[in-house]
Amino acid sequence: AGCHAEEIALHRNASEALETVIFGIELNAGDEVVLAKQDYPNMIGAWKQREKREGIKLVWVNVELPSEDENYLVKKYTDAFTPKTKVVQVTHMINWIGQKMPVRKIADAAKKKNIDVLVDGAHTFAHFEFLIPDLNCDYFGTSLHKWLGAPIGTGLLYVRKEKIKNTWPLFGAGDKDED
């Protein structure tokens, strides 16, 4: 994975890992989250729950797929960024059609605007050769049973070290460490 052990948390699957971030990071009413209509339904449902409960705003990217034009794909996301955008979720590979998204380019653009990047890597971890930190994302969730061949019920969450202290666990477990 290319990251430090303290940046990794084991989960039951990608959905649980990603929902730990979706429900565990602080967002305020009016803050915007950019995501795509092609994202996995569980993740969309989790974001919609936060929208309904807390008044965050979901900004939808609708890309025409498949596409071999990475610049087009990046532009669809970056055009959705505003000064209120706090998070962008990018699905590394859209499972419906196998479209691999240019995560690093989207993340680089987001970082220039101080936007956190959450990557759904359920269909790329151990399928393609890459290191999570090379994606320049803050959070990455995956299921280990797919391409890694680990037992069903194993998932992984990567949280960039400096983001750990501001990410609450999905399930409480006593006092939270400062880092």
Residue ranges and their predicted role:
Residues A1-D179:
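Pyridoxal 5′-phosphate
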